[in-house]
């Protein structure tokens, strides 16, 4: 449980394991339930198109997401699981506060994340920006 009292639903952990071990999912988007007491799965997808994933992040509200990021730098195809904390500048203040104070609870539940990204704008989660972050040494 987080400082905010928010819990992580068991389906979040199941979805993470499905993405990490099953390799059937490409990404999962998480949100707060309506009462802001639990983090739940909003969407699971097998779509490999990064722009489709970005389209599932709302322009005006917060979300968390995990993405199995695939890239090739000439050494063969590699994958890294990234955790994204999405908090757009135009999101409601209360939403930003709850998501911010609950992020670590969800993040700690996931072992095997390669890169964490905190984003307030789509430019911070653009493919090239993410590629740069996951390939930093």
Curated annotation (Swiss-Prot):
One family name in Pfam for this protein: Cofilin_ADF
Cellular component GO terms held in the UniProt record: actin cortical patch; actin cytoskeleton; cell division site; cell tip; cytoplasm; medial cortex; mitotic actomyosin contractile ring; nuclear matrix
Protein name: Cofilin
Underlying gene: cof1
Role according to the record: Controls reversibly actin polymerization and depolymerization in a pH-sensitive manner. It has the ability to bind G- and F-actin in a 1:1 ratio of cofilin to actin. Binding to F-actin is regulated by tropomyosin. It is the major component of intranuclear and cytoplasmic actin rods. Required for accumulation of actin at the cell division site via depolymerizing actin at the cell ends. In association with myosin II has a role in the assembly of the contractile ring via severing actin filaments. Involved in the maintenance of the contractile ring once formed.
Membership in a protein family: Belongs to the actin-binding proteins ADF family.
GO molecular function, a single term: actin filament severing activity
GO biological process, one term: mitotic actomyosin contractile ring assembly
Record keyword Metal-binding present: no
Signal sequence extent: none
Domain of life: Eukaryota
Gene3D superfamilies from the UniProt entry: Severin
PANTHER family xref list: COFILIN-RELATED
């Amino acid at each position: 449980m987080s400082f905010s009292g928010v819990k992580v639903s068991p389906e979040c952990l199941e979805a993470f394991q499905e993405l990490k071990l099953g390799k059937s999912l490409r990404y999962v988007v998480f949100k707060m339930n309506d009462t802001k007491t639990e983090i739940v799965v909003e969407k699971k997808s097998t779509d490999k198109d990064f722009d489709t994933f970005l389209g599932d992040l709302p322009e005006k509200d917060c979300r968390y997401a995990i993405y199995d990021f695939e890239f090739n730098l000439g050494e063969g195809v590699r994958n890294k699981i990234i955790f994204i904390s999405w908090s757009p500048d135009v999101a409601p203040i209360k939403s930003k506060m709850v998501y911010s104070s609950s992020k670590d609870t969800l993040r700690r539940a996931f072992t095997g994340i390669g890169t964490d990204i905190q984003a307030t704008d789509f430019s911070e989660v653009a493919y090239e920006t993410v590629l740069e972050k996951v390939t930093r040494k």
